Amino acid sequence: MIVDGRLATVVIPRDAIEGAQEPDKAVMQAVVGYVNDIQRSGVYPRHEMPAAAMQTYHAVYYLAQVNNGGHGQFIRNTGIAMLPTTSGDALAGLKAMGALAQHQILVEMLAWVKANLEQAAKQNGFSARGDVLKALDDRFHAAEREKPIARLAARWIAGWPGLRIVGREQYQAEIDRLAQLNPHLPQRRVWQSVQQLRLQMTDDPRITIAAACGAVKPQPEVKLEVRPGVNMEIEGQQCMAFGVGTNKGARLCVFEKTGGRLYELDRSGGRVAAGAQLSTVGADKVQQFVKVAGQVRAAEAIDLLLRKAGLDPLAMITAWEVFDGGVTWIVATGQTRAAAAINGDGAVLTKPDQTPIAGAARDDIERYAAVAATGGESLRPPA
């Protein structure tokens, strides 16, 4: 049910909480799972979700971040720009469940951030951890020992009027039913699908990794997976390196402002290190991929091609070739590997032996881009 523009129902599976060793935490995590599932399936933005569910979601996020790396990690991982929204939800949830001590601590943290923006931006919870935040961490942990958020949240959640506890076999059907209540669902699903491709084409680390894989000679390597980046020493220098899975195996990709370098992953001697260098790609080449991809609407084109071919649009892409007015990507989806060549005239998806799989004219791509744009616009909060 949708009431005043928001979903009014929260569904959690019974087996997620019955028999759990820590039932209070299990209830919280079930709500987090619901938020993730319904936002993925129904493409509901925050302002269309049940308010209490979003408040719980961000209160649990706050709890997890502080427990792991203190308020400094919470600030770092949330980002200064998103801190007011995330903290606003968490504060509302903490107040509603009765976690008043933790609520006050978060209020004080926000006041400190507002007064010390430059210092706040440097916090990470570990190597950079301000004295004020250390004191807040200590108070938070003391409050948790006295009145843990999990216990308070579980009691609060149990009283929600829109809560439905169902069998596991019913859970996905209920998520699908709630998703179908979204009047903008088809356009939003196109937007959501296009966005995950666009992110791979525009986010600096992701596109650099994609281009470094595509630059391997004599044959490009197909990017299949990217793991979180870590600081490590490579060739005598501290670098930001990402674990990468390709069709040839495990790799490391160094990301720098000047570009990227792809290495074999060396696990000999019980350590993780960079092995032989496989490729290098400069920032200029990376930005050329970004520019041309935007000009020819590469994200929309690939999504359209995959759907026309009956393939899963949730794909990983490798930046292979770029030239004035055109770009070619290697697309990996499921067990399929294909090349997507896109230019001003249109796009074609081909098998490794160059057999065409699907094609799209420029007009088709532009119409599809308009559908995605409509879906994106519908996600904006009302004025």
Residue ranges, per PLM feature:
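Membrane topogenic helices and adjacent juxtamembrane segments
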Residues: 1-52
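Generic hydrophobic, helix-prone segments enriched in Leu/Val/Ile
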Residues: 26-34, 149-154, 208-213, 253-255, ...
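Charge-rich, solvent-exposed alpha-helical interaction surfaces
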Residues: 30, 34, 93, 135, ...
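Surface-exposed polar/charged interaction patches
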Residues: 37, 41, 65, 69, ...
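Core of folded catalytic or high-affinity ligand/protein-binding domains
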Residues: 45-141
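Long, amphipathic alpha-helical surface segments
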Residues: 118-186
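Charge-rich interaction segments
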Residues: 171-242
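Extended, charged low-complexity segments
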Residues: 229-383
